[in-house]
Structures are given as structure tokens and as C-alpha cells.
């Protein structure tokens, strides 16, 4: 007897991965001038529970945030309010994250009613 593999069901977005990099041809002196305020405001977002985790990029200047936000538009607006965003010195790539939906294909998993 073969088990039915559930069809693909949607999974919710539970976090946003935000990869921030300094824009090309930016004067680094401007970045360093703004950086202390950027760090303080980023810490505030962390303490407010908006940023879950943060890391630095190893291959170039930039940061990675795992945001406790589910809407990319909200994430974009939040990050653009940071000092480097307001100065148009940093840009973010936003990637919605969710549960590993492939786990639904494990034997014995049954689709949940929607």
C-alpha cells in the first residue's frame, strides 16, 4: 500500500532575511560618520524584538539580519528608516523565510485542512 504524498501547500512567512550592503561608489567617510547612530538604532530594533539575529558578511562589508517581521514591505520600511538607509548609503535584499515545506513530504505526514 503506497502512501499519498501531500500536494504542495503554502507555508507562512515567519521571518525575513535581510542582507544589507553598502551601495557602490559610496564615500566611506560618510558611512563611518553615520555608523555610530546606525549601530544605536539597530540595537534599539534588536531590543524591541524586531531583529532576532544579526551577523556581519564575511566576503564584503555588510550585515545580515533575521527579522521578526513577516511582511517584506514592513521590513523594507523599517530598514529604510535607519540612518544609512535615510542617507541612501545602504541597500537591503529581503528574502521571506518560512518553515521547511519539504518536510510535508515525509512518509506519514498528512495535509492540514486549510
Language-model-detected regions and their locations in the chain:
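Conserved, structured core segments of small domains
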Residues: 1-114
Amino acid at each position: 500500500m503506497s502512501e499519498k504524498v501531500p500536494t504542495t501547500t503554502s507555508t507562512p512567512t515567519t521571518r525575513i532575511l535581510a542582507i544589507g550592503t553598502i551601495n557602490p561608489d559610496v564615500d566611506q567617510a560618510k558611512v563611518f560618520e553615520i555608523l555610530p547612530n546606525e549601530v544605536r538604532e539597530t540595537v534599539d530594533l534588536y531590543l524591541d524584538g524586531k531583529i532576532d539575529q544579526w551577523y556581519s558578511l564575511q566576503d564584503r562589508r555588510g550585515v545580515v539580519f533575521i527579522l521578526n517581521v513577516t511582511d517584506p514591505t514592513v521590513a523594507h520600511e523599517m530598514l529604510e528608516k535607519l540612518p544609512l538607509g535615510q542617507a541612501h548609503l545602504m541597500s537591503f535584499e529581503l528574502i521571506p523565510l518560512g518553515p521547511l515545506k519539504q518536510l510535508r513530504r515525509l512518509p506519514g505526514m498528512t495535509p492540514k485542512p486549510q
